[in-house]
């Protein structure tokens, strides 16, 4: 991108974002990232137990999808440099264990957490510094984690994901999954 920004009039922004979550996520235990898999584990839990791999200490920065879309809209409208790299995230790391506990609490389910210590615990903590996005574009994440979790749980329930046994609802037209780009649903 940087090379092409030097030889032509097109401007490029490389967005380095944290873990994105929200409605229309992939809620699949085998194929999704930590948020989607955790929601699926909690909502599909049997016997009143949710199992966490390792000790649950790994920590991730989670960013609600609408906040990322808002940044993309701002970058498209306000970018002045030919090329730039911008970090976009919540700026806060949450442990897998704390995420599991919050999803359980907000789901209203009565579940107990167990640990599978045969699985790895990788000492990892990531919190994205979004100060450049804030300074250059006036951007800050707007969605609190608990609010984003509630919106995601509602979408999951409304979409009937667990009952249908798939990651996302299919569009009624041509059997496609709805595409969402820059806040506009295209079906």
Place the predicted regions along the sequence by residue:
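Flexible, glycine-rich beta-alpha linker
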Residues: 13-35, 58-59
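Sequence-level detector for tyrosine residue identity
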Residues: 3-4, 12, 21, 27, ...
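Active-site Tyr-X1-5-Lys
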Residues: 1-18, 34-47
């Amino acid at each position: 991108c940087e090379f092409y920004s030097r030889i032509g009039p097109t401007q490029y922004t490389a967005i380095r974002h944290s873990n994105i979550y929200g409605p229309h996520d992939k809620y699949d235990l085998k194929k999704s990232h930590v948020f989607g898999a955790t929601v699926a584990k909690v909502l599909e839990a049997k016997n009143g137990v949710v199992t966490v791999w390792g000790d649950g200490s790994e920590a991730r920065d989670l960013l609600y999808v609408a906040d990322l879309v808002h940044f993309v809209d701002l970058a498209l409208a306000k970018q002045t440099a030919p090329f730039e790299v911008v970090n976009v995230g919540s700026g806060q790391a949450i442990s897998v264990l704390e995420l599991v506990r919050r999803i359980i609490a907000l789901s209203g389910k009565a579940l107990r957490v167990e640990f599978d210590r045969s699985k790895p615990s990788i000492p990892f903590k990531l919190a994205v510094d979004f100060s450049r996005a804030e300074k250059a574009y006036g951007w800050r994440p707007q969605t609190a984690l608990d609010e984003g979790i509630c919106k995601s749980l509602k979408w999951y329930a409304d979409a009937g994901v667990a009952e249908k046994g798939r990651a996302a609802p299919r569009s009624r037209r041509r059997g496609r999954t709805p595409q969402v780009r820059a806040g506009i649903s295209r079906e």
